[in-house]
Amino acid sequence: MQRLLTPVKRILQLTRAVQETSLTPARLLPVAHQRFSTASAVPLAKTDTWPKDVGILALEVYFPAQYVDQTDLEKYNNVEAGKYTVGLGQTRMGFCSVQEDINSLCLTVVQRLMERIQLPWDSVGRLEVGTETIIDKSKAVKTVLMELFQDSGNTDIEGIDTTNACYGGTASLFNAANWMESSSWDGRYAMVVCGDIAVYPSGNARPTGGAGAVAMLIGPKAPLALERGLRGTHMENVYDFYKPNLASEYPIVDGKLSIQCYLRALDRCYTSYRKKIQNQWKQAGSDRPFTLDDLQYMIFHTPFCKMVQKSLARLMFNDFLSASSDTQTSLYKGLEAFGGLKLEDTYTNKDLDKALLKASQDMFDKKTKASLYLSTHNGNMYTSSLYGCLASLLSHHSAQELAGSRIGAFSYGSGLAASFFSFRVSQDAAPGSPLDKLVSSTSDLPKRLASRKCVSPEEFTEIMNQREQFYHKVNFSPPGDTNSLFPGTWYLERVDEQHRRKYARRPV
């Protein structure tokens, strides 16, 4: 009967549900975790106006409880010191044992978010999962997550899995916002879940792995609002990174090509975004160019941290080429010699790279460096990487520092699909405001990362070998001690003879 209620009655129900303590989930996180933001009730969906400020109300990040130190890995792999820590910009890499898979990661992050904000399970009307970690060619991760909603009786939840390399989470976010701004919206929240396990065979690519998941609650009047009409997208057919071997977790990667594809997509998405925002400004009576100065912060999909620094420098080069000769000389000192170049001719120009990195260093430190905290200490989370960067940015700034700012975001998925978009941060940073609660909810990120167990390269390699051994195996229970997992973590308990997976949760 729930789905047959009028929108007004439905909203009144949700309002009461959030307010009544009797509807608080029975299994809550420890008291220390209950200080995080509780989203307000969703306003009524109207047919004559857009819901205002649709965006991120709350988010949760999950990463595995163990990591391998990249300095130790350099020694173990007999490579020069600094190859991973300096060349890639990585210090630690989180990873999953056989006990965790993409379903368990997503189960964990969704339940952690719902319990922390104490949201009734029937207040979610859309849930979509972005992932490229495929363990079943038919059954979606979303269907497994429906187990969490069973006790509430809420089966009326739209959305399913979205897959294209590291882009699925962003596609899911856009779909959630589009749903909320459409006639299909029933007044409830949307949830976006993105997660992946990034693993590679032994060799040069293995240190660029990682694992994790992010869940985001989407709704109107959000402290991080998606800016409407401001998405620059580029898509094309290319084989830079792909996974055609369904018997293996490992991808086929053309590293040099993938970097060029990433930068080319960045150029084109940024160009499209600039045109759209400049058109909006022109319609509002302001005819001026958009530059990086109009972004207070900038986050990127992060395959490895050095790639991000190079990408911000690339955006500066776009601004440089678009500027007048006088502006080039006055604002972009050290780049004058590159003024006659075309973007498409510069992807392998090392002299330009060095000049750009030097010229953009201060901008990188101010706009982007803080967003790389999780990536530096956990590695590449594929489709959740960009949103891990968002959480890192929030964890390293106060609500007052963020208030009123614009956060640029670049999402890239090999194959390829890419978008450049932006969030507008709420002006209200008062204690107890939605922005203050959202920022506070990320404040324990450094502490949580520090609480993980450091595993030797030898043990890490053995666990990677186990993942190969048990991949698509049937009739087994994963090896390992569940006490090594964080409290409240879901894990794979058993795979039966028909490939059916059973999960359990470590007590909170």
Curated annotation (Swiss-Prot):
<keyword id="KW-0597">Phosphoprotein</keyword>
<keyword id="KW-0444">Lipid biosynthesis</keyword>
<feature type="modified residue" description="N6-succinyllysine; alternate">
    <location>
        <position position="310"/>
    </location>
</feature>
<dbReference type="GO" id="GO:0045471">
    <property type="term" value="P:response to ethanol"/>
</dbReference>
<feature type="modified residue" description="N6-succinyllysine; alternate">
    <location>
        <position position="447"/>
    </location>
</feature>
<dbReference type="InterPro" id="IPR013746">
    <property type="entry name" value="HMG_CoA_synt_C_dom"/>
</dbReference>
<dbReference type="InterPro" id="IPR016039">
    <property type="entry name" value="Thiolase-like"/>
</dbReference>
<dbReference type="GO" id="GO:0005739">
    <property type="term" value="C:mitochondrion"/>
</dbReference>
<dbReference type="InterPro" id="IPR010122">
    <property type="entry name" value="HMG_CoA_synthase_euk"/>
</dbReference>
<feature type="modified residue" description="N6-succinyllysine; alternate">
    <location>
        <position position="354"/>
    </location>
</feature>
<dbReference type="GO" id="GO:0033574">
    <property type="term" value="P:response to testosterone"/>
</dbReference>
<dbReference type="GO" id="GO:0071398">
    <property type="term" value="P:cellular response to fatty acid"/>
</dbReference>
<dbReference type="GO" id="GO:0004421">
    <property type="term" value="F:hydroxymethylglutaryl-CoA synthase activity"/>
</dbReference>
<comment type="pathway">
    <text>Metabolic intermediate biosynthesis; (R)-mevalonate biosynthesis; (R)-mevalonate from acetyl-CoA: step 2/3.</text>
</comment>
<dbReference type="GO" id="GO:0007494">
    <property type="term" value="P:midgut development"/>
</dbReference>
<feature type="modified residue" description="N6-acetyllysine; alternate">
    <location>
        <position position="83"/>
    </location>
</feature>
<feature type="binding site">
    <location>
        <position position="208"/>
    </location>
    <ligand>
        <name>(3S)-3-hydroxy-3-methylglutaryl-CoA</name>
    </ligand>
</feature>
<feature type="modified residue" description="N6-acetyllysine; alternate">
    <location>
        <position position="473"/>
    </location>
</feature>
<feature type="modified residue" description="N6-acetyllysine; alternate">
    <location>
        <position position="354"/>
    </location>
</feature>
<dbReference type="GO" id="GO:0034014">
    <property type="term" value="P:response to triglyceride"/>
</dbReference>
<feature type="modified residue" description="N6-acetyllysine">
    <location>
        <position position="243"/>
    </location>
</feature>
<dbReference type="InterPro" id="IPR000590">
    <property type="entry name" value="HMG_CoA_synt_AS"/>
</dbReference>
<feature type="binding site">
    <location>
        <position position="258"/>
    </location>
    <ligand>
        <name>(3S)-3-hydroxy-3-methylglutaryl-CoA</name>
    </ligand>
</feature>
<feature type="binding site">
    <location>
        <position position="301"/>
    </location>
    <ligand>
        <name>(3S)-3-hydroxy-3-methylglutaryl-CoA</name>
    </ligand>
</feature>
<keyword id="KW-0809">Transit peptide</keyword>
<dbReference type="GO" id="GO:0001822">
    <property type="term" value="P:kidney development"/>
</dbReference>
<feature type="active site" description="Proton donor/acceptor">
    <location>
        <position position="132"/>
    </location>
</feature>
<dbReference type="GO" id="GO:0010038">
    <property type="term" value="P:response to metal ion"/>
</dbReference>
<dbReference type="GO" id="GO:0070543">
    <property type="term" value="P:response to linoleic acid"/>
</dbReference>
<feature type="active site" description="Acyl-thioester intermediate">
    <location>
        <position position="166"/>
    </location>
</feature>
<keyword id="KW-0753">Steroid metabolism</keyword>
<feature type="binding site">
    <location>
        <position position="81"/>
    </location>
    <ligand>
        <name>(3S)-3-hydroxy-3-methylglutaryl-CoA</name>
    </ligand>
</feature>
<feature type="binding site">
    <location>
        <position position="310"/>
    </location>
    <ligand>
        <name>(3S)-3-hydroxy-3-methylglutaryl-CoA</name>
    </ligand>
</feature>
<feature type="modified residue" description="N6-succinyllysine">
    <location>
        <position position="52"/>
    </location>
</feature>
<feature type="modified residue" description="N6-succinyllysine; alternate">
    <location>
        <position position="358"/>
    </location>
</feature>
<feature type="modified residue" description="N6-acetyllysine; alternate">
    <location>
        <position position="256"/>
    </location>
</feature>
<dbReference type="GO" id="GO:0071230">
    <property type="term" value="P:cellular response to amino acid stimulus"/>
</dbReference>
<dbReference type="GO" id="GO:0032869">
    <property type="term" value="P:cellular response to insulin stimulus"/>
</dbReference>
<dbReference type="GO" id="GO:0051591">
    <property type="term" value="P:response to cAMP"/>
</dbReference>
<dbReference type="GO" id="GO:0001889">
    <property type="term" value="P:liver development"/>
</dbReference>
<comment type="subunit">
    <text>Homodimer.</text>
</comment>
<feature type="modified residue" description="N6-acetyllysine">
    <location>
        <position position="306"/>
    </location>
</feature>
